[in-house]
């Protein structure tokens, strides 16, 4: 089920991103320094008082004719429309400005719970300044210093108090997947074709409060799927154009809710930076991935076309070497019947557990093939390994010194584990930890 969503809004330079980072915590750290892995942190997941929620950072809004301001307002309006709770950030150092009043007028129209966070209240003497912000008519102001972490707990308490009631727990065996990709790659046609191919009765299921329609269906073997809709909001009746900022934001939300992501490419247009950016986020989030090349029927092909495409994909998505590639046509339904089985196989891979004894046999065999590296005369020693999580499969390798585990050797061990076990379509995480 969709997580509740919190939007952080305000004029430029009031510290929205600092507050966002403070709330998001470690979630926003970059896991892998790999080209194409997203660095865009407009969206993250946080947890407070055992309530999990999504947070969206937005650009600074101002009532001026500045470059890109219309796009920024547009993105912020979308975020506010999606949000269950809105955090309005202002600056205690500067007091109420015309831009603050402009944003406040936007917020009046949302009829959503508003948390007024007066940021940059960095010392106790400034706390009296917050009373001026009652004039905005948005309730009690919360004094905050995002830089020092002062007052953020009070803001989080207020957020949790205003979250919608928790939803019923979903069927744990259900596989959730989404189709992501640039506008016009044919996601909607693929969704319709997949549902038609399954010949099932599709039932729309509303999300928590945003009316983002998911579709639940069952295949011929009785496996239940939830297809997560990324087509946008319908609640307000508004139609939003596909600005990149918005499509990135909703793709991130869909990825976060998914077990498996179908990364859809357009055979007519090739691979773009947007594709790599979104695929990088799915990889970093540890999701199962299938690379789906749609509109395959539109290309003039020879015996090398598919091979050339595969080589190009592997070259441009090097960090997705584990992801299967399938060439399909939503129009002719070419190969679409294979997708549900691929999704099920990847879901099984994500949930695979390897007994420690078997895993350590593979590790020892790997060391025999390629001995552990040395650094300044000191050799890496691997004592044992164990699996600590699934979705994605995560392994901790206990060593004498963590810094002796070079990235290249960790990658070698990953490749050996992949050769020994079926982990198609899912990333696996290996973590070196010093044995105590």
Swiss-Prot record:
Ranges where the EngA-type G domain occurs: 4-167, 175-351
InterPro entries in alphabetical order: G_ENGA, GTP-bd, GTPase_Der, KH_dom-like, KH_dom-like_a/b, P-loop_NTPase, Small_GTP-bd
Q: Which residues bind GTP 2?
A: 181-188, 229-233, 294-297
Role this protein plays: GTPase that plays an essential role in the late steps of ribosome biogenesis.
Q: Which PANTHER family match?
A: GTPASE DER (PTHR43834:SF6)
On subunit structure and binding partners, the annotation says: Associates with the 50S ribosomal subunit.
Q: What is this protein called?
A: GTPase Der
Q: What is the lineage of its organism?
A: Bacteria, Bacillati, Bacillota, Bacilli, Lactobacillales
């Amino acid at each position: 089920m969709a997580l509740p969503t919190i939007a952080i809004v305000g004029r430029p330079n009031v510290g929205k991103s600092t507050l966002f980072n403070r709330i998001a915590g470690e979630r926003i750290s970059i896991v892998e320094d790999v080209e194409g892995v997203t660095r865009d942190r407009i969206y993250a997941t946080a947890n407070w008082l055992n309530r999990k929620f999504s947070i969206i950072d937005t650009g600074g809004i101002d009532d001026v004719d500045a470059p890109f301001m219309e796009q920024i307002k547009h993105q912020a309006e979308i975020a506010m429309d999606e949000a269950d709770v809105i955090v309005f950030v202002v600056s205690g150092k500067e007091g109420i400005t015309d831009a603050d009043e402009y944003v406040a007028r936007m917020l009046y129209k949302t009829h959503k719970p508003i948390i007024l966070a007066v940021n940059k209240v960095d010392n106790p003497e400034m706390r009296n300044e917050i009373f001026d912000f009652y004039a905005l008519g948005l309730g009690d102001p919360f004094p905050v210093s995002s830089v020092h972490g002062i007052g953020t707990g009070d803001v989080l308490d207020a957020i949790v108090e205003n979250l919608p009631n928790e939803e019923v727990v979903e069927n744990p065996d259900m596989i959730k997947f989404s189709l992501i990709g640039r506008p016009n790659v044919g996601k909607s046609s693929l969704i319709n074709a997949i549902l038609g191919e399954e010949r099932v009765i599709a039932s729309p299921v509303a999300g928590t409060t945003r009316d983002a329609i998911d579709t639940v269906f069952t295949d011929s073997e009785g496996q239940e799927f939830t297809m997560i809709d990324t087509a946008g909001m319908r609640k307000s009746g508004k139609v939003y154009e596909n600005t990149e900022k918005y499509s990135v934001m909703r793709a991130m939300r869909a990825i976060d809710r998914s077990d498996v992501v179908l990364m859809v490419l357009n055979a007519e247009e090739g691979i773009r930076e947007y594709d790599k950016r979104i695929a990088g986020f799915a990889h970093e989030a540890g999701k199962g991935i299938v690379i789906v090349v749609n509109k395959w029927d539109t290309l003039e092909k020879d015996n090398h076309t598919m091979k050339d495409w595969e080589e190009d994909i592997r070259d441009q998505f090097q960090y997705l070497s584990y992801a299967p590639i399938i060439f399909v046509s939503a129009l002719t339904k070419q190969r679409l019947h294979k997708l549900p089985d691929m999704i099920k196989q990847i879901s099984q891979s994500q949930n695979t557990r390897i007994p420690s004894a078997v895993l350590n046999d593979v590790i020892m065999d790997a060391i025999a093939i390629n001995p552990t590296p040395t650094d300044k005369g000191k050799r890496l020693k691997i004592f044992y390994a164990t699996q600590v999580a699934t979705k994605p499969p995560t392994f901790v390798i206990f060593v004498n010194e963590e810094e002796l585990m070079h990235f290249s050797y960790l990658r070698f061990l990953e490749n050996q584990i992949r050769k020994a076990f079926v982990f198609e379509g899912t990333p696996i995480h290996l973590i070196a930890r010093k044995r105590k």
